Amino acid sequence: FGVPQLRKRLIFIATKDDSNMPEFIFPSPTHADRYNTVWDAIGDLPLIGAGESADRYKTKPISEFQRIMRSKRSKLYNHKAPNHPQETVEKIRSTVPGEPMYEKYRQRIRLAWDMPSPTQLAGGIRPQFQFGHPEVPRGLTVRERARIQSFPDDYIFTGGVVQGRVQTGNAVPPLLAMAIGSSIDKMLTEFYQKVKLVENM
């Protein structure tokens, strides 16, 4: 559904047996052949170093996904990079994008521009750092994580980097929620049209 992330989700939609509700039809995938990549998601955000921040865009949107995420905003929120020891910076710098940064923790990779992100987690080995940025040797900002989850830039996360990581990692991606919500709306519309038809007979 356009979320630039490889993540499996288990979604339950339930109705009462005696409600005469139409069968729920799960929405068909929209981006199976042309998925959004990390570049599509965050390629327009300012390239900042570890411990740095930025509150203004420096370029125009490059992809349709970025255009949707910005929605004509000029101010940028939650784009503060976690600070790392120099040893960590060098570890990220020496890692090829798409490859794990640590042999022991192979789920901690440096993201690649041309692929979707793996699953964004709320927890992890360290509170500030799960994936490395594809180009800059640091972990992701809350805004970059939010983009990868398909949160628009006008959604502002409160708290620090750790709280932002928990909020983004635990969330259902808005684009997924919108697709499922649209299917629920169709099901309910069909149901109430039938109810109204029966009442008018």
Question: What are these model-predicted stretches?
Answer:
Residues 59-201:
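C-terminal target-recognition/interaction regions appended to catalytic cores
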Residues 1-101:
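Class I S-adenosyl-L-methionine
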